[in-house]
Design a protein with these regions (language model features):
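Alpha-helical transmembrane segments of multi-pass inner-membrane proteins
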Residues: 143-170, 179-182, 189-258
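Long extracytoplasmic/lumenal interhelical loops at the membrane interface
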Residues: 292-365, 382-387
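N-terminal hydrophobic segments of proteins, predominantly signal-anchor/transmembrane helices
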Residues: 28-47, 62-120, 408
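Loop-to-helix entry and N-terminal half of a specific, functionally important transmembrane alpha helix
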Residues: 31-38, 382-414
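Transmembrane alpha-helices of multi-pass inner-membrane enzymes
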Residues: 68, 399-444
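A membrane-periplasm/extracellular boundary helix in multi-pass inner-membrane enzymes
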Residues: 4, 154, 160-164, 253-302, ...
C-alpha cells in the first residue's frame, strides 16, 4: 500500500464516527424529537386530560432535556465553541446574581431557580440540538411538523366553529376564552394559551417553506401541510401569526428568486408552487369569514395602539428602566407568572409585559443588557450564516427557519412564557443545526 493510500485510509478512519458516540447521538436526537412533540401536546394534557396535576405537567419536558444534556456531555458530543463558553459563563454569573437576590430581597429560591431555568436551561438544549442533529434529523423534524399540522388544523377549525362555552374551547383554570370578535374564539389548538398556538403557526409555516425547498420531500406532504397551516393561520385571530406568515413568505420568495431554474431543481420549484397555492388558496377559498373577522379585529386594535410604535418601543424600552432596575435588578424570575406564584402564592405579572424591559428589571442593567445582547448578536450571526448558505449552496432551509426564530430571539417572551421559551430555543437550535450541516446538502 502506498503512502498516499495509507494517509487516505487513516483520514477516512478518522472521519468515521465512534460507534458508542454515534449511538449516544442518536439517543439524544430521539430525546429532542420527544421533547418537541411534548411541547405541542403538553397543553392538551394540562387542560383536558390531567388538569388536577397541570402544574407538574408544565415541567414534563424537562427530564428529557436533562437526559439529553447528560448524554451529550458524557459522550463529548458538544464542542466548547465560543457560544458554548459564553453561555456557560453567563449562566454561572446568573447563579451568583440569583443568590444575591435571595439574600438582598429575601426572594424565594424557587423563584430564582425558575427564572434561571427560563434563561438558560433551554438555551443549553438549543446548543445540544445544534451539536448533534444532522441534516436528515433536521428534515425529519420538519416533516413531523407538517404531519402534526393536519390534525391541528382540524382541531382549530372545530374550535373556531364552536361557541366559547364548548368543551373544545375550555381554558385552563376555567377562564373565559379570548375572542376575535363577538362569539368567535381565538383558537388555541392543543395549547393552554394563544401565545403557544401562535408559535405553532409560525414554526409550521417556517417548516412548510423549508420543506418546499428540500429535494426529496413529498409534495403531497407539502400540500396537505399547507392546508393544515392555512387553517391554523386563518382561525388564529392573531396579528403576530400573520406577521410570521408575512416574514416567512417574503423570505421564501426571495430565496426562490435567487435560486437557478435548473432541471434538477424543478421538484423544488414545484414544492414552492404547492406551498403557495395550498396556503393562499386555502385562506381565500375556505376562510373568507375568518379573514373578515381578523380584519375587523386589526381595525379595532389599530384604534387603540400603533403596532409599529409598539414594535419599536419593545426594543427601546429596555434602556429606559435602568433607574428602576439598578445595576443588579429586582429579582431573577420575579417578573414571570410562575415566579410570582412561587414568591407570593398568586400568579401575576408584576413587571413589564415586553421581554427586553422585563429582563432588565429582573436582572439589572449589567446582566439584562448582557443577556439580551447575546440574543441580538446570535440573531445577527445566524442571519449572516444563513445568507452565506444560500449564496454558497442554494440552501434556503437555514434562512427560512430564521424567519421564525429570530423574531422570538429579538422580541419574543422567551423568558416569560413556557411554550414561547420552548419554541424559541428549540428552533434556534434547529437553525444552528441546519447551518452546521448545510455542506451535507452538496452530497445529496
Amino acid at each position: 500500500m502506498t503512502a498516499s493510500a495509507t494517509s487516505r485510509s487513516a483520514l477516512l478512519q478518522n472521519m468515521l464516527p465512534d460507534p458508542l458516540r454515534e449511538q449516544a447521538r442518536r439517543k439524544v436526537v430521539t430525546l429532542i424529537l420527544i421533547t418537541y412533540v411534548l411541547l405541542i401536546l403538553e397543553g392538551a394534557l394540562r387542560k383536558w386530560a390531567l388538569e388536577p396535576v397541570h402544574k407538574a405537567l408544565f415541567f414534563i419536558r424537562d427530564p428529557f432535556v436533562a437526559l439529553s444534556l447528560f448524554l451529550c456531555f458524557r459522550h463529548r458530543l458538544i464542542e466548547m465553541t465560543p457560544l458554548v463558553i459564553i453561555a456557560l459563563g453567563m449562566s454561572v454569573c446568573f447563579l451568583f446574581l440569583g443568590g444575591y437576590h435571595i439574600i438582598a430581597f429575601n426572594l424565594n429560591p424557587v423563584t430564582v431557580a425558575y427564572g434561571w431555568r427560563n434563561y438558560f436551561y433551554y438555551l443549553f438544549f438549543a446548543l445540544v440540538i445544534a451539536a448533534v442533529m444532522r441534516r436528515a434529523d433536521v428534515d425529519r423534524l420538519i416533516r413531523w411538523s407538517l404531519i402534526i399540522a393536519m390534525p391541528m388544523g382540524a382541531l382549530a377549525f372545530i374550535q373556531w366553529r364552536s361557541p366559547p362555552s364548548a368543551w373544545v374551547n375550555y381554558q385552563l383554570g376555567g377562564g373565559d376564552a379570548f375572542l376575535v370578535t363577538a362569539g368567535v374564539v381565538r383558537t388555541t389548538g392543543t395549547f393552554t394559551f394563544t401565545a403557544g398556538f401562535v408559535c405553532f403557526v409560525g414554526a409550521t409555516l417556517a417548516c412548510l417553506a423549508a420543506a418546499a425547498f428540500t429535494r426529496g420531500c413529498s409534495k403531497w406532504l407539502v400540500a396537505f401541510g399547507a392546508a393544515g397551516a392555512a387553517t391554523c393561520l386563518a382561525t388564529s385571530g392573531s396579528r403576530m401569526a400573520f406577521m410570521h406568515a408575512g416574514v416567512t413568505g417574503l423570505i421564501a420568495f426571495a430565496c426562490e428568486a435567487v435560486r437557478p431554474l435548473a432541471s434538477q431543481r424543478l421538484a423544488v420549484h414545484a414544492g414552492v408552487v404547492c406551498m403557495t397555492v395550498g396556503l393562499i388558496g386555502g385562506l381565500m377559498v375556505f376562510y373568507p369569514q375568518a379573514l373578515d373577522q381578523m380584519a375587523e379585529r386589526s381595525h379595532i386594535a389599530s384604534q387603540h395602539e400603533d403596532s409599529g410604535k409598539r414594535f419599536l418601543w419593545s426594543f427601546l424600552s429596555g434602556f429606559t428602566v435602568g433607574e428602576e432596575s439598578g445595576l443588579f435588578g429586582l429579582g431573577l424570575g420575579a417578573g414571570t407568572g410562575g415566579g410570582s406564584l412561587a414568591a407570593t402564592g398568586q400568579q401575576a405579572f408584576t413587571m413589564a409585559e415586553d421581554e427586553f424591559p422585563r429582563v432588565v428589571l429582573e436582572t439589572g442593567l449589567i446582566f439584562g443588557l448582557g443577556f439580551m445582547g447575546l440574543r441580538f448578536i446570535l440573531s445577527a450571526w445566524m442571519l449572516w450564516q444563513s445568507i452565506c448558505c444560500i449564496r454558497a449552496r442554494q440552501d434556503a432551509v437555514p434562512l427560512l427557519l430564521c424567519s421564525f426564530c429570530i423574531p422570538l430571539l429579538l422580541i419574543g417572551q422567551m423568558t416569560m412564557q413556557g411554550t414561547v421559551n420552548g419554541y424559541g430555543f428549540i428552533f434556534t437550535g434547529l437553525t444552528l443545526a441546519a447551518i452546521n450541516t448545510s455542506a451535507e446538502t452538496e452530497l445529496s
